[in-house]
């Protein structure tokens, strides 16, 4: 049995502030240790539950945050950027039985600690077929096309509530309770590691591949915080303006949908001006 862990950082133990997840800051150095602890707890739990292989895919920012030297020696880690499926890279090869979303967070326009969808502030909302979408929701639809179930989700309490919509049977672990976008009641790393390890062990039993789900077409709508970003996004083929700050596109598969979304976010990031956004 092989488990894939998609590891993001905003939903990690102790993380509440932008500097906590911004590579190179003193706070990031401190928080990446707690992030690594969360991931390692999931790794150990999956091995406890009978997994033969566990692959961790780094999914935050530069995708070079986890401390490999502190992970269980049995694990493998995919680190670095420019991956075909980004946050869920590795699911497409046909050998993954279940996936865990560790350190996940709520989506743009939602309540939740450091809530966003791909871009920190420039995107104010994303909708998938009319439903407001977090990264978890988008990624769950991608992995469903490969017959892989989401078996574990960790993050703040809002991220766990969000996961009820896209992975109702998955085990959930709230490592902190949302107070505001930049505040939370946090549990200690020792406590969250124990909770995550226990949940991952139980979640291993949910790692049973199912027939691929072909739920298309998928219409993705994106709202930005500035008009010129919507204009920039229309450079991507198939992306059309639907309002002053909104665009939308339709894809037959989520594989195509997520890759188009990546293209949109890449171009929009380059279009942001330092002073006016």
Regions found by a protein language model. Name each.
Residues 1-4:
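Extreme N-terminal starter segment of soluble prokaryotic enzymes
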Residues 6-7, 57-58, 99-104, 153-154, ...:
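Short beta-strand segments
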Residues 19-44:
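Short catalytic helix/loop segments, enriched in acidic residues and glycine
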Residues 37-93:
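Glycine-rich nucleotide/cofactor/substrate-binding loop typically near the N-terminus or early
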Residues 78-121:
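N-terminal glycine-rich phosphate/adenylate-binding segment common to multiple enzyme folds
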Residues 83-84, 120-146, 154-158:
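Active-site glycine-rich loop that binds ribose-phosphate moieties when present
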Residues 142-204:
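Active-site rim beta-loop-alpha module in soluble metabolic enzymes
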Residues 192-277:
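C-terminal accessory domains and tails appended to enzymatic cores
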């Amino acid at each position: 049995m092989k488990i894939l862990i998609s590891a993001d950082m905003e939903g990690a133990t102790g993380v509440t502030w932008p500097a906590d997840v911004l590579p190179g800051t003193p706070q990031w150095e401190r928080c990446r240790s707690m992030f690594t602890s969360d991931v390692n707890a999931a790794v150990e739990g999956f091995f406890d539950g009978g997994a033969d292989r566990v692959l961790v895919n780094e999914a935050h920012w530069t995708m070079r945050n986890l401390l490999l030297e502190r992970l269980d020696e049995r694990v493998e880690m995919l680190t670095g950027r420019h991956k075909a499926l980004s946050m869920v890279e590795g699911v497409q090869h046909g050998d993954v039985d279940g996936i865990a979303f560790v350190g996940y967070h709520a989506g743009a326009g939602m309540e939740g600690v450091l809530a966003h969808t791909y871009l920190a502030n420039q995107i104010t909302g994303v909708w998938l077929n009319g439903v407001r979408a977090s990264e978890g929701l988008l990624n769950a639809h991608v992995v469903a096309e490969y017959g892989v179930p989401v078996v574990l989700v960790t993050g703040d309490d809002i991220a766990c509530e969000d996961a009820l919509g896209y992975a109702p049977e998955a085990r959930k672990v709230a490592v902190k309770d949302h107070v505001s976008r930049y505040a939370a009641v946090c549990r200690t790393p020792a406590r969250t590691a124990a909770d995550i390890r226990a949940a991952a062990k139980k979640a291993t039993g949910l790692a049973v591949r199912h027939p691929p789900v072909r739920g298309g077409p998928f219409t993705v709508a994106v709202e930005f915080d500035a008009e010129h970003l919507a204009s920039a996004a229309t450079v991507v083929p198939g992306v059309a303006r639907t309002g002053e700050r909104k665009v939308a596109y339709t894809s037959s598969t989520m594989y195509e949908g997520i890759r188009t979304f990546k293209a949109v976010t890449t171009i929009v990031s380059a279009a942001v001006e330092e002073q006016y956004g």
